[in-house]
Amino acid sequence: MLLQRQFEMPESFFVLSKDYLELATDEITALAKMHDRFSKIKIISNLVIVQSKTNWNEISKRATFVKISGQILRKMSGLFLDEENVGVLKNAKTFVCRIINLSSNQINIPELENSMGDMISKFSHAKVNLENPDITVYLIFTNNENFFGFSKRTKKMARTKKIKKFPHELDWKLTRVMINLIGLEKGETVCDPFCGTGTTLLEAESMGIHGIGLDFDEKMCKIAKANLKTNGYNSEI
């Protein structure tokens, strides 16, 4: 039964920035396992494939170094599309095709994207929209496998703002990764004993995690409070 359950679980893909790639892949793994301990992970360079019951966007919206993400529909042995492949466009009014080449082969990306768009148009009533499509269709090339996938339009998360900064404060990306590697879930609490300008608290609150901050410097506590207030967060300082 377990094998059948895993076989039927959908696959998601995450194309990561190559900055801190090892941390980035560990973060995706931690987030996937946090939501579903039966998740299976496959890493191909800066592409991470996750087989899990968890929706790709639940992982992507918390991850730090994800450039592109979505759901895999199938592996591709060739560039052949049929009605089954484009069924995801059934209720979409607009779409765009995007090629992600992670292989060592030279590919004429604009030409291939146009060809894909033409093929999809034969099976779907959706129109091409390059700026703000309902669905983005992806063809991902690697040296060993090709994948056909998609993502639906999602609302972009606003970055937290700081009205006051400090030269030696924590980098927000590394801070967010650390929180995610710990595996804290929404509604849980993180405590930062040296909160400084509030970077850890801001990142935690942006993911629905409560924060408690301490600092021996009263000036830093005031700065952290001001930064939290600007974003409407209520971490305890």
What residues fall within each predicted segment?
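Phosphate-coordination loops involved in phosphoryl transfer and adenosine-cofactor binding
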Residues: 91-94, 187
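Basic, glycine-rich polyanion-binding accessory segments appended to enzymes
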Residues: 94-100
